[in-house]
Amino acid sequence: MLEFNQSQPLTLGVELELMILNRRDYNLTRGSDDLLLQINRKPHGYDIKPEITQGMIEIGTAVHSDVNAMLDELLAIRTLLVDSAHKLNLGLAGGGAHPFQHWEDQRIYPKERYKLVSELYGYLAKQFTVYGQHIHIGCPDGDAAVRLTHYLARYIPHFIALSASSPFYQGVDTSFQTSRLTSVNAFPLSGCMPVVDSWDAFNAYFERMEALGIVASMKDFYWDIRPKPEYGTVEIRICDTPLSVETPVLLAAYAQMLARRCFEESWNDICPEPYLTYSYNRFQACRFGFDGVMVDARSKSQLGLQEDLLDTLRALEPHAEALGSQHQLAALRQRALKCHSDSRWLRQIFEQSGSLSEVVRRQSEHWMYAEPGVGVN
């Protein structure tokens, strides 16, 4: 039986997967071991670790209740990473997928879990060289985590549109705002959590899947949102890694506002109807971003994603005030109003330069050096 470890409600943590680049043509390089060795020459106390292939590195924040403190920590981690990368002549970048790397060139990181994933999923493991942001939100108990997971499912298209940063993949423009999620879709346990209404019901589902030999732990579920019982959180896993160090904090603030509304209103309207259109709405956000549509199965209506996001932000104003996140709410509103996205900026660079290497060089410079408040648009 999975035990849900209680945590302070509405606390936050984020994880970011980053590209490791050579500085000749800005392709991925197998630099994670060398970079980690350089980073760990002196004690630092930050959560920095390898990921499934050797052109990736993951950073994680501590637990925060205040998003401004989270930004301060991310800036400090960035300083450490950039200093270490300079010593090795490496570049670092955000973005959901490298624009022109080829999956067959990647190497699995020599860690037992990654070896098992590679043995089970074959070439999909190397194709999983994509880069995401995960957001953890503290929950008081397992029942609250189940409710919040279902509540957030309605807003997943918003997170996709706000974070989309992978228009190019394997050297081509995909026509999508985010190509990263197509790699995630290939895994059999991707998608969304089943419609269970309590932690006991979730445990019964998990135990059945475990008894069937399908899963051994929660890590085997590649859902867009999942409870994380060992942390006492709900984890949003849908976002591309943004191009700047500030945008992850805006996304975390949005998640915190939504969670506060869910908890304050004692939301418990768990039913299967919203999941009838979940995959379609998710596709619309991946393909069209802010220009996508959202279909409401209950009201049998369609609404533009941008309009729905702006309506939601208006409804969250009292929660932003209570959390001290008015600045973040205003920044999110501006992005939605102007349809500002990382994907659009990357396409503009390619239109100007005609070079995907130049695209990656610019996105690397932005992640490594841009000051907070300096947007890509």
UniProtKB/Swiss-Prot annotation:
Domain of life, source organism: Bacteria
Give one Pfam hit by family name: GCS2
Q: One GO MF term, please? A: ATP binding
Keywords in alphabetical order: ATP-binding, Ligase, Nucleotide-binding
State the SUPFAM superfamilies in the record.
Glutamine synthetase/guanido kinase
Record field: catalytic activity: L-cysteine + L-glutamate + ATP = gamma-L-glutamyl-L-cysteine + ADP + phosphate + H(+)
Asked if the keyword Ligase belongs to this entry, the reply reads yes
Q: Its GO biological process terms?
A: modified amino acid biosynthetic process
Keyword Nucleotide-binding present in the record's keywords: the answer is yes
Provide the coiled-coil residue spans: none
Q: What is its EC number?
A: 6.3.2.2
Q: Which InterPro entries match?
A: GCL_type2/YbdK_subfam (IPR050141), GCS2 (IPR006336), Gln_synth/guanido_kin_cat_dom (IPR014746), YbdK (IPR011793)
What the protein does? ATP-dependent carboxylate-amine ligase which exhibits weak glutamate--cysteine ligase activity.
Record family assignment: Belongs to the glutamate--cysteine ligase type 2 family. YbdK subfamily.
Q: What is this protein called?
A: Putative glutamate--cysteine ligase 2
